[in-house]
Every structure is written in C-alpha cells, then in structure tokens.
C-alpha cells in the first residue's frame, strides 16, 4: 500500500516564514543576537533534517553555536533505531536541567524519530518539565510556529500527531559542508522489517517530485558542491507513489547528466528492490560513484524470512554478483545483525560464509536483541548475551581481515580523491568508493580532486602521496 503524497502549500510555508519574522523581531527588541545549538543523533537523514532546522534558525536570526551551555535554543534531533541511543538521549536531556537552571530563558526542544513514539512524548511530558516542545519528523516544517508559540508564552508544544504523506519543499538549509551535500529524495519506509521501528516513526514511503530533486542538485553543483548523497530509507523504492513513471535508476541517470565536475552516490538500498537496471545505470555513468551500501543483515534464508526482508540468501548473492560483474571496481559495504532471535550457530556460520564470499570493504555490525516495539522484540531469544558477543567478535575479526586485504590491494595504485579537510598535519580525502585517505599536502588542495598514489594501508584507512607533490 502506498500513501498518497501531498506537498505542503506555499501559503502554509509562508505562514512559517511569517513566524520566523516574528521570532527575529522578538530578538531585536532584546538588543542582541540569539544563539542556538542543534545536537544530532543517528542516520544521515537526521543530519539532513538538522540542516533544515539550522536553516529555519538562521532565518529567525539565530547564530549557531557548538554547545548547549548558554544557548538560547537547544534542539535534540533524535534516533530511535537502538534502545541504547534512546537512553543516551534521555540522559543528556536530563543533564539539560542543570543548564536551564543556569539559563532560565533557554528553550529546549526534542524532535526526530524518538519524538514520533507516544511513549517518548508521554515520558517527556510528565518527567522532563524543562523541555519546552516535542515535534515528530512529520512536523519539522512547522518548527518556526512551534518556536514562536513558546517564545510568545504559550504552553509547552507537542506536535506529535501522525501526519503521513506530507512533503515540504523550499525549507532553508544551513549545510555542514560546501563540498558535500545530503539530498533527501524520499521519506518513510513500507518494508516493516521485524526489527525496525522506522516505518512507525517516519511513516510510509513518500517520494519528492523529480523536478524538485533535480533543481536542488543543479543549484548545489552550480554552487561548487562536489559530492552529493541521495537519501532515503529505501532509495530503490523511489517513484512508486508518483504518477510520472520515473524510478530510482531514471532519477540517478538524470542527475548524472547535469553538467559539472561532481559525483553522486546514494543510501540506503534495500536488496528487495535493487535491480539490474539500477546496476547498469551505475555502470553507464562516470558521475555515479561505484559504491554500493546494500545491507544483507543475515546470511541465513530462514533468519531473513524471520526478519521480513523479502529476499533470501541466493537472491541477494545473485544481485551482488551481477553488480560486481558490470562494475568490477565496485566498493561494497553492508549492515549485518548478529544474534537475531532464534539464530543458530549454523545460521551464524552462513553469515560468515556470505561475508567471505562477497568481500565487503567494510561492515556495520549490530548485536541483537532488537529494541522494544517492533515484532522481533517479542520473539523467543534463547541465545545468551555472552554467545552473541562471541559471534560479534568473530564476525568483526573476519571482516577486519577482509578490509585490510582490500585496502592493501590499493597500494601502488593512483586514485582520484576529493580532498575534504585536514587532520592534524595531514590532509584527508575520500576515494570514489568512500575510502578514507590521509596524505601530506597544502591547504589550497581542500575542495579539489587530487590524484593520490596509495603508499600504505590499514584496516580502516589508506595513506598516500599526491601526484603533484614530490
């Protein structure tokens, strides 16, 4: 089932910008520039959302600062994927009690995926009276109104009602980087994996119109952006709720044909919807990075079925093998869950054998049990924690050896890399496949592509020498 996607009207957005003007006027009467701090937890989509929050704050006249201490506004943009992350948020939220005691006029807001959980908003309402507002991801576009309501003396704000199907275009953004950019192409997820809470807190899949995405990408490229990452909980489902007939491969091809010197990449891909058409498109266009994050989660078909992943081991391997055939230089990464409820030792060994077969450049492993809420939390889970930790350690050892082997294969090769910063006395850069490279160089190289010859490698990164530096 696809939710009908609606776009927030210009009149509704104008009302939000009017609230920005009211907030700015409020601070003008105070005779000083207000400050704001945004703390982001979790995934790249949350990072993109925080850029929009900072955009609204800038429109309201706030200067962005790097600490909650003394800030006039504090926003905690939260993640609900792991229970540990939620507990960390509550701990930090509690610590803000002392910050607000020192600065009584400070306004504190909680947003993001946690805010979409009724139990979280209820807990904040009753146990964290110093928090001035809670709003879910569906209400991010209404933040100026929420902020103005608080500043003008209205009661605590709770914008948490489920509002699926809405997309807001034209929200200002203050991006973290001028070189790299996140571009959200869709929101929500329809897959309902049994361990995942995302569909419950971010809603069903909603795709942005292709012309809006293309316009955003063109503006970024014209402004000097060199690396664009397209974001979605499942980018491969893009367009299924639109009437234009454009799927994700079509969108990717259209972006790759925009004039300019840049790369486009994407995350996250669900194997269920990854197609040969997508892989052929990636192979065809040089501006599409030959990097693919394709989470397999388990090497056991039985466990995959219990996860409600909609594919089996054989299907996953067929797709990966085709992708590697048409893109021999492809850099593959993945997520994997260790100790899913009911996973046997034999099924864990199937995961190990898949890792050894595919040869991922890196993995992002997680230990089950799943967080409370999704169906997997209620499954029988007889495997002791110590055994799960043992499996986790073994998996990491296997993957670390593979990562080091892959990185060692780069030694002696010259790779085109985007130089993105400095780490102490070395510059840092990223290969087309997303590998970290450190090398000696000049600051004027930052923001440019450089040909770097790899001279050394570790499990986690590469070292090299720029071609134009002897």
Task: Report residues per predicted region.
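Short glycine-enriched, charge-decorated loop/helix-capping segments at active-site entrances
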Residues: 80-81, 202-203, 242-245, 305-312, ...
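Conserved SAM/AdoMet-binding glycine-rich loop
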Residues: 105-110, 117-119, 221-345, 356
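Short flexible coil/turn linkers enriched for glycine and charged/polar residues
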Residues: 176-179, 189-191, 288, 298, ...
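Terminal RNA-binding accessory module
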Residues: 1, 6, 376-470
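Proteins enriched for Cys/Gly/acidic motifs involved in redox and nucleic-acid/cofactor modification
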Residues: 1-238, 277, 314-325, 353-357, ...
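Contiguous mid-protein beta-loop-alpha structural module that forms a pocket-lining wall or clamp
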Residues: 343, 350, 358-360
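Conserved, mostly hydrophobic/aromatic
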Residues: 193, 213, 230, 266, ...
